[in-house]
Design a protein with these regions (language model features):
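N-terminal, active-site-proximal structural segment of metallo-dependent hydrolase catalytic domains
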Residues: 2-6, 18-81, 93-97, 153, ...
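Sec-dependent signal peptide hydrophobic core
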Residues: 5-13
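Active-site-proximal beta-strand elements of phosphoester/diester hydrolases
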Residues: 22-34, 113, 128-142
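Active-site beta-strand/loop signature of hydrolases that rely on acidic residues for catalysis
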Residues: 23-30, 45-69, 136-139, 154-182, ...
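N-terminal post-signal-peptidase region of extra-cytosolic proteins
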Residues: 37-45, 87-89, 195-201
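Structured beta-strand-rich core segments of catalytic domains in phosphoester-bond hydrolases
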Residues: 37-38, 62-134, 224-231
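Metal-dependent phosphoester-hydrolase catalytic domains
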Residues: 114-115, 145-149, 157-167, 173-249
Length: 249
């Protein structure tokens, strides 16, 4: 499976137009690198990420120096194992450290900011990172539909003056036909195939993980390749991959 995935991605990258801006995006709720077998395994998660050769990755459910993960900064481990640059945002204090989300990227961000998101059962957050050719947002949304709806105008407000292509990815905790997703669709184009389910990893029966392109500032997105990676063990979610070509204004 890994060889076939690598060859498919390589084919897309080789035959894309040379002048086109193309971005290989992954969204992955890594469940703090605890697999369906209850085993902590950072290398296993890193291997899943690396086999897709991503330009950028949105990660959810990361411990940072907590008692639970024996003082390890999970994103730092994944940085070392993948060779990508990490950007971390704590959502809540947890067991002497924190718990949050992150980005892994080939480029170091020019700058980034962290914006609190609604979350009545647990505080949530959004990372907005600017790169040379695009802006990337990573998030893990609330379990509560009311919070998810409240988050949409906050996201839109944060992005309304950005004049680069914008992507957003994460575990949105909502179904494709839900009210929060319909509200997001007023501002974002969904790039992944929502009929390919992402959760739970061993027997997926729903799509709650998404990759989007922002549709309000004149850029268009041509999906070259998209896939839910068929990994049943590394996390409780399956990772979502999209290779997209950006078309200018």
């Amino acid at each position: 499976m890994k060889r076939n995935l690598f060859l498919s991605v390589l084919f897309v990258l080789m035959f894309a137009p040379a002048h086109a801006q193309q971005v290989n995006i992954l969204s992955y709720n890594v469940h703090n690198c605890i697999g369906m077998d209850k085993e902590y395994n950072y290398r296993r998660i890193a291997n899943v990420i690396s086999q897709t050769s991503p330009d950028i990755v949105a990660l959810q459910e990361l411990d940072s120096v907590t008692v639970r993960n024996k003082g390890i900064h999970a994103l730092g481990e994944l940085e070392k194992l993948t060779g990508l640059h990490g950007t971390y945002a704590a959502a809540i204090p947890f067991q002497g450290g924190s718990y949050g989300i992150g980005i892994l990227s080939r480029e170091i961000p020019i700058k980034y900011k962290i914006i609190p998101m609604p979350g009545r059962e647990e505080k949530r957050t959004l990372i907005i990172a600017e790169f040379k050719d695009y802006v990337f947002c990573a998030t893990h949304q609330s379990l509560t539909p009311e919070d998810q709806l409240l988050a949409v105008p906050l996201i839109e407000k944060a992005l309304q003056n950005v004049d680069k292509p914008i992507f957003m990815a994460g575990d949105m905790n909502s179904a494709p036909a839900s009210a929060p997703q319909l509200e997001l669709a007023k501002h974002f184009a969904t790039l992944n195939d929502t009929t390919s389910y992402t959760f739970p990893a061993d027997r997926p029966n729903r799509c709650i993980d998404y990759i989007y392109g922002y549709s309000k500032n004149g850029y268009r997105f041509d999906v070259q390749y998209r896939k839910v990676i068929e990994d049943t063990i590394s996390s409780d979610h399956r990772p979502v991959q999209v290779i997209v070509q950006v078309k200018g204004k």
